[in-house]
């Protein structure tokens, strides 16, 4: 594996990526390793879930997480304690996926455990600060995991990653912009379009199961387009 670049390690955006905070020579390799194990490995399961959403293949997800943590460890001296470690790790994960795994992805293994955990669904339902509406929250509460999975996998990749980071992981717009390396306006656009597509599919699933009255989604869309 080649040297970690500033882009991969997340050194271009946000104070969490600045090589500051610990004096030169103030931390030994053993101390840094212990700090990495203590702080970074806490997010391992969440990182794997995110990698699985991106790659849609368990083997690729494992490889992506392994490479992400190798890069994170190599550049951990650049991370400033007390800032957002989770966002810093997700930036490395997302950049590694975009730069590597997107180009050489294997075919998805649909039968594998591509699951959204119950706690993730609950967080997605309760994450209302950026505008989730009743259709999503109702569907996430009542629909089978397989339906939510299928809907998320069906929306385009850039939308899927933005929606995942916002509505499952709970990142704010600015954090998502830093993670994805895009302007906040682009993040907002991707979230709006991704959520709209996701809402339409979830409403279809919910109508098929009698959870949403027939025509409810269409009437809301008509109101929105007429305003």
Swiss-Prot record:
Post-translational modification: SigR is present in multiple forms of different pI, suggesting other unknown post-translational modifications. SigR prime is probably partially degraded by ClpP1-ClpP2.
Keywords: DNA-binding, Sigma factor, Transcription, Transcription regulation
Region named Sigma-70 factor domain-2: 43-106
Organism domain of life: Bacteria
SUPFAM superfamilies in UniProt: Sigma2 domain of RNA polymerase sigma factors, Sigma3 and sigma4 domains of RNA polymerase sigma factors
Induction: Expressed from 2 promoters, 1 of which (sigRp2) positively regulates its own expression. The same promoter is transiently induced (about 70-fold) by the thiol-oxiding agent diamide. Also induced when mycothiol is oxidized or conjugated.
Chain intervals for the UniProt region annotation (Sigma-70 factor domain-4): 148-198
Example GO molecular function: DNA binding
Database matches in CDD domains: Sigma70_r4
Phenotype upon loss of function: Increased sensitivity to redox-cycling compounds menadione and plumbagin, and to diamide. Loss of expression of mycothiol biosynthetic and recycling genes.
Family the entry assigns: Belongs to the sigma-70 factor family. ECF subfamily.
Description of how the protein assembles with itself and partners: Interacts transiently with the RNA polymerase catalytic core formed by RpoA, RpoB, RpoC and RpoZ (2 alpha, 1 beta, 1 beta' and 1 omega subunit) to form the RNA polymerase holoenzyme that can initiate transcription. Interacts with cognate anti-sigma factor RsrA under reducing but not oxiding conditions, which prevents it from binding to RNA polymerase. Treatment with the thiol-oxidzing agent diamide inhibits the interaction.
Stated role: Sigma factors are initiation factors that promote the attachment of RNA polymerase to specific initiation sites and are then released. Extracytoplasmic function (ECF) sigma factors are held in an inactive form by an anti-sigma factor (RsrA) until released. Responds to thiol-oxidative stress, involved in regulation of about 30 genes and operons, including the thioredoxin system (trxB-trxA, trxC), ribosomal protein L31, RNA polymerase-binding protein RbpA and mycothiol (MSH) biosynthetic (mshA) and recycling genes (mca).
Protein name stated in the entry: ECF RNA polymerase sigma factor SigR
Gene: sigR
């Amino acid at each position: 594996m080649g040297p970690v670049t500033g882009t991969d390690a997340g050194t271009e955006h946000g104070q969490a990526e600045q090589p500051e905070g610990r004096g030169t020579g103030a931390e030994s390799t053993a101390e840094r390793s212990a700090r990495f194990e203590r702080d970074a490995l806490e997010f391992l399961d969440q990182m794997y879930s995110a990698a699985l959403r991106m790659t849609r293949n368990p083997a690729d997800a494992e490889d992506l997480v392994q490479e992400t943590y190798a890069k994170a460890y190599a550049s951990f001296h650049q991370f400033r304690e007390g800032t957002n470690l989770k966002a810093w790790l997700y930036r490395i994960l997302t950049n590694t996926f975009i730069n590597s795994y997107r180009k050489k992805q294997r075919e998805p293994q649909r039968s594998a455990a591509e699951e959204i955990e119950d706690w993730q669904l609950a967080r997605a339902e309760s994450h209302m600060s950026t505008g989730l509406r009743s259709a999503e929250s109702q569907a996430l509460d009542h629909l089978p995991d397989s339906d939510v999975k299928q809907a998320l996998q069906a929306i385009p990749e850039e939308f899927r990653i933005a929606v995942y980071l916002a509505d499952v992981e709970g990142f704010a717009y600015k954090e998502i912009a830093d993670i994805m390396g895009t302007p906040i306006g682009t993040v907002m656009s991707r979230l709006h379009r991704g959520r709209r597509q996701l809402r339409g599919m979830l409403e279809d699933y919910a109508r098929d199961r009698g959870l949403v009255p027939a025509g409810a989604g269409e009437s809301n869309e008509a109101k929105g387009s007429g305003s």
